[in-house]
Amino acid sequence: MSKSTAEIRQAFLDFFHSKGHQVVASSSLVPHNDPTLLFTNAGMNQFKDVFLGLDKRNYSRATTSQRCVRAGGKHNDLENVGYTARHHTFFEMLGNFSFGDYFKHDAIQFAWELLTSEKWFALPKERLWVTVYESDDEAYEIWEKEVGIPRERIIRIGDNKGAPYASDNFWQMGDTGPCGPCTEIFYDHGDHIWGGPPGSPEEDGDRYIEIWNIVFMQFNRQADGTMEPLPKPSVDTGMGLERIAAVLQHVNSNYDIDLFRTLIQAVAKVTGATDLSNKSLRVIADHIRSCAFLIADGVMPSNENRGYVLRRIIRRAVRHGNMLGAKETFFYKLVGPLIDVMGSAGEDLKRQQAQVEQVLKTEEEQFARTLERGLALLDEELAKLSGDTLDGETAFRLYDTYGFPVDLTADVCRERNIKVDEAGFEAAMEEQRRRAREASGFGADYNAMIRVDSASEFKGYDHLELNGKVTALFVDGKAVDAINAGQEAVVVLDQTPFYAESGGQVGDKGELKGANFSFAVEDTQKYGQAIGHIGKLAAGSLKVGDAVQADVDEARRARIRLNHSATHLMHAALRQVLGTHVSQKGSLVNDKVLRFDFSHNEAMKPEEIRAVEDLVNAQIRRNLPIETNIMDLEAAKAKGAMALFGEKYDERVRVLSMGDFSTELCGGTHASRTGDIGLFRIISESGTAAGVRRIEAVTGEGAITTVHADSDRLSEVAHLLKGDSNNLADKVRSVLERTRQLEKELQQLKEQAAAQESANLSSKAIDVNGVKLLVSELSGVEPKMLRTMVDDLKNQLGSTIIVLATVAEGKVSLIAGVSKDVTDRVKAGELIGMVAQQVGGKGGGRPDMAQAGGTDAAALPAALASVKGWVSAKLQ
C-alpha cells in the first residue's frame, strides 16, 4: 500500500532527523526582512542569511517541509495551473541543509538511501537518472563509483543559457555571492509516456521527471566573475512533496495524488460539479491551498503587492467556480477539507480557520457582484472581435470597472484561442503601477543592500549608555573607512545599547560621541547580526576602529517601553473580550502612539472598546511584574506564549510575561511593572482590510493629555450651552429637539412660499401650439424645492411643458416637467439635456420629469431663451 502525502512528508523529516538534522518548522509565506522577495518560494529562503554568513544557528544540519507560493514576480506559475500536471501556486518543498557541515558525499548518499532503501521510499534503482554540472567530476564519480549508477544514466549538463556558469545545473543566489554546481535526480515513469532524458531534445516530455535538486554551495562569485572557493561549503536541497508523492503513489499527475483527489472531491461537492476530470476542479483545489495559507500568514486581499496577488488567485478560483455552475459562495467552504487533508502541516491554519473563512467569503461576495456583468462585457467584446487579440484598453476596463485581473481575462480568452494585448494593458496601468510601487516600499534603498560580516552585541535591556568601537561604516550602502562632518551614514558598533527596529517597535534615537565628534542617530536597524545606527555626523570625523560613547534618548525610550508593554496587555484583553480568533496582523510601537492590527470580522462596538480599555487599565492597577525568560521555542509555545505575525524566531527565544494575564514571545523593551504604564486609552478603531481591524492607543502622559483635551472640550461646550458638564447631555438633547422643530417650521414656510411662487408663475405661461410653456429663472429658491414647484404647476396648467432654474453658489440647478399627454412629442430628459449642455452640465430622467446641473451661470439666460424655439419645433 502506497504512503499518503502526509506520511511521505513525515518520513522525509524522520529520515533526516535520524541523520542528525534539526527539524525546523516551515517559515511564513511572507519573507522576513527580504524586500527582494514577494513570497517564500524555496526551502532555503529562511536560511538565506545563514548561507550569506549574516546569521548563525545553533545547528549545522537542518531539514524542513517549507510551504511555498509561486504566483506573481519572477516565479509565477499562475497561468499554467489547471492546464499542466505539475504546476501549482502553492507547494511544499522538502529540503535538507548543511551549513558548513557535510558536503557532496553525504548529501548524495543521504538522497540515495532515502529514495531506494526498503525502509524508506523503496524506489526501483533502475528508474533513477541523475544530472551533474559538466565540470563537476567529484559528483560524477560519487554517483558512478560509490552509488553505482551506470554511466548511461549519469548526464553532464553544461552552460546551456548563453553565459559561463549559466546552466540548469549551476545554482547562484545572485550576480555575486554563494553559488555552485548542482546534481538533479530524475524518475523515469516508463516508455508508455512520451519524453526523453534531461539534455535531450525530448526532455520537456513527462516521462523523466525531476524529483530532487541538490545544490553544492562551494564558491563565492566576485563582482568581476571570478569564483573563489568557500572556506566552508554548504548544501541546499529541494524536493517537491507533490512530485515525490505522485511517484510513490504511482500516478503521472500531481493532481492524482491522495491530497488533491480529496480536495477535488470537496470542490465538486460545494460547486455541484459531476465531471471530476474538469480542469476547473484542479484550479480551485490548487488555489484554496495558496489562498488559505497566505491569509493565515497575514496577507489580506488588496490592490497592492502581495494582497493583489492573493486577490488575483481568489478571483481566478471564483471564476472557475462560476464555470462549474456554483450558485452561491463556495470557496470558503474548502478551508475545512484542506485542514483535514494537510494533517500536522495544517495546524497553523486550523487555529485561524474562522478568520480565513470569513476573509475568503467576504472577498468572494464582493467579486460576485461584478463577475457576471464583467463576463457579459467580455463576451460582447469577444463576439465583436475580428482578429485573435483582445485590445489592452478593454482588458484594462475589465480590471478597473469589474475587478478582473488581466490574467483572469487572459484565462477566459485562452479558452477561445484568443490572446490579450498585455502591452496595451500595461500602458493603461503604468501610472497605477508606479503609485503602487512607491507606496509599497519596494523601491531602491541603499541601506537595504548593506551586508555586514561582523556582529553587534545588544546590551540595551540593561544599559542606555555604553562605550563601544566602530566596526564598520556605510555611506549610500557602500562600506567606507571614514566619514566627515555633514555626511549621512550607517555606523556599526561591536556593542550597543540602541534597540534596532523589530517586532513592531521602532529603532532608538540618540547620539554617538567622542572627544572630537558627534553623530546624531535618527534610526537603528538590523543588518543580519549587526546593528546599524543611521544618522548624520554633526561635527568632527569618524573612522572604523574609533571608540565611541553610545547614548540612547532615554525619555523617548521610556515612552516606547510603556507603549510596547501596553500593546501586550491590549492583545490579551482583545482575546478575552472578542474571542481567541484574535491574532496580531501587524503593529507599530513608537514614543507617541501604539498601533495594533488584528484579525476580527466586524467593527468593534463601543461597549467592546470600553471593555478592552477597562481590562487593560485593571491590569495596570494590579501593578503586575513584567518578567523575561529565555527558553527553547517549542517549550515557549507549550507554555502558551503567543508568537507574532511576520517575525522570525531563533531556537532559543525571549518570553515576556505580565503576571498571569499575558505571555508572548518578544525581543522588545518593556516597563518593569504594568503600573508604570499609568493610564491606557484607545483613541481610534478602524478597518484596514477584509477581516483586519486597527486600534490606535496612547499611554502614560500621552493618555493624560487626551483626558485633559476631552475635559477642555466638554468645558467649552458647557460654556456655550450655558450649563455645566453634569447636565450637558440633557442640554444637547434639548438644543437638538428645538433645532428639529425649527427646521420643520422652516420647511413648512418654504413650501408655502414655493406654492405662492408657483401660483404667481402660472400666469406667466405662454401658449405654444395648444400647450402651456413656462420657462423661468428663480432667485432665493432652494434647488430641492424646484421639483415640488413643477408638480404644483403641472396640476395648475394641464397640458404643459415647464423648465425652472436657479443658481446657488455659482452652480446651476435645472428641472423640466412635461405633462403625460405631451410626452409622446416632447420628453423631459431630452429637453433638460439640451439646456444643460449650454450651461456646461448634463442630466437626465423620465419622459415626464428630468433634472440637471451646470457650472456656467452666465450662460443660463441664453439657454432658457432657446427653449421656446426647441419646443415649437417639436410641437409642429
Curated annotation (Swiss-Prot):
Positions with a binding annotation for Zn(2+): H564, H568, C666, H670
A GO biological-process term: negative regulation of DNA-templated transcription
Cofactor(s) needed for function: Zn(2+)
Keyword Nucleotide-binding: yes
Keywords: Acetylation, Aminoacyl-tRNA synthetase, ATP-binding, Cytoplasm, Ligase, Metal-binding, Nucleotide-binding, Protein biosynthesis, RNA-binding, tRNA-binding, Zinc
Catalyzed reactions per annotation: tRNA(Ala) + L-alanine + ATP = L-alanyl-tRNA(Ala) + AMP + diphosphate
Localization per record: Cytoplasm
Pfam families assigned to the protein according to its UniProt record, in alphabetical order: DHHA1 (PF02272), tRNA-synt_2c (PF01411), tRNA_SAD (PF07973)
Superkingdom in the source lineage: Bacteria
Enzyme Commission (EC) number: 6.1.1.7
Cofactor annotation remark: Binds 1 zinc ion per subunit.
Top-rank EC class of the record's enzyme: ligase
Function of the molecule: Catalyzes the attachment of alanine to tRNA(Ala) in a two-step reaction: alanine is first activated by ATP to form Ala-AMP and then transferred to the acceptor end of tRNA(Ala). Also edits incorrectly charged Ser-tRNA(Ala) and Gly-tRNA(Ala) via its editing domain.
Record text on subunit structure and interactions: Homotetramer.
Entry remark concerning the domains of this protein: Consists of three domains; the N-terminal catalytic domain, the editing domain and the C-terminal C-Ala domain. The editing domain removes incorrectly charged amino acids, while the C-Ala domain, along with tRNA(Ala), serves as a bridge to cooperatively bring together the editing and aminoacylation centers thus stimulating deacylation of misacylated tRNAs.
Alphabetized NCBIfam families for the sequence: alaS
Name of this chain's protein: Alanine--tRNA ligase
Species annotation: Escherichia coli O139:H28 (strain E24377A / ETEC)
Native organism taxonomy: Bacteria, Pseudomonadati, Pseudomonadota, Gammaproteobacteria, Enterobacterales
